[in-house]
Design a protein with these regions (language model features):
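N-terminal loops that bind phosphate or other acidic moieties
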Residues: 1-64, 68-133
Length: 133
């Protein structure tokens, strides 16, 4: 079994840093999570250059990105052709906490599948009585 040695959090703006800070408020320190921020004016190759040394230094990783079809995903997809990394889109707070807590319980590819399977359960519509019309 090849576990995810690292969790990569790669998003637009500072979302990844703030998401990690919020997760740590709930679950404690997440030393296994490294954040990467795509900032205005940054080229995809700049982001790739920041992430690649981390991937080169670990046995396997899971990368959590914010949205499908944009630069963070595209960069991680390119890197996944060279390194053992599973890329998951749609990162949210419950997913990050689950990734950190389950990282050593399953293979890095299984972890990616597990994280995607939990997406439907992380959103709910709550209607309070006062909202009725």
């Amino acid at each position: 079994m090849q576990i995810a040695e690292k969790i990569i959090l790669c998003t637009h703006g500072y979302f990844s840093e703030k998401l990690k800070e919020s997760a740590e408020m709930i679950a404690g320190p997440m030393d296994d999570v490294t954040t990467f921020c795509l900032l205005p004016g940054m080229e995809p190759d700049d982001l790739k250059g920041q992430i690649e040394p981390l991937l080169a230094s670990c046995s396997a990783a899971v990368a959590l990105v914010d949205i499908a079809g944009d630069t963070p995903l595209n960069v991680m997809a390119r890197l996944s052709a060279q390194y053992p990394v599973t890329v998951v889109t749609g990162v949210n707070l419950p997913m990050l906490i689950e990734a950190s807590e389950s990282r050593t319980d399953m293979d890095y590819q299984e972890l990616g599948t597990h994280l995607v399977s939990m997406l439907p359960s992380t959103g709910r519509v709550i209607q309070m009585k006062g909202a009725e019309k």
